[in-house]
């Protein structure tokens, strides 16, 4: 069927991309924009751009990934990864309000890491009370004791 054929073709283009054929990223974007292979390639591309400290270009790639994975028929896992990476870039450039905005979709999420990220951004904005609430939610959500301790340290630094 058509979907299977598209998946096979996207897989072949993705494998060529992994072998170093950068023009295949454009082919993936243009010919298979909603394919999981395209999403993986975009995530990989953003990582490479960040390694080269090209944050603006990485943001553009991640925003494209976010847009193509959004919605009812989107890919929620890739969308969440895109949003996390976008938020982390915004945190690193002190664009705290943009970090909070990109994470807003997950404000009721049970993922403690999302609460921790949002708390970091809120702290940067000077919204201490909301940051404390988010850190508390992260602490409650983490089962790993070392992660809890890290967030507890962040919380104690906010309270100083």
Model region roles, listed by residue range:
Residues 33-38, 73-78, 110-113, 117, ...:
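Structural signature of alpha-solenoid helical repeat junctions
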Residues 12-19, 31, 48, 89, ...:
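Residue-level signature for tetratricopeptide repeat
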Residues 132-160:
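Terminal, low-structured helical/coil segments at or just beyond the last alpha-helical repeat
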Residues 2, 27-36, 64-74, 104-110, ...:
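Solenoid-like repeat scaffolds
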Residues 43-113:
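Alpha-helical adaptor scaffolds
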Residues 51, 92, 124, 157-160:
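Register position in tetratricopeptide repeats
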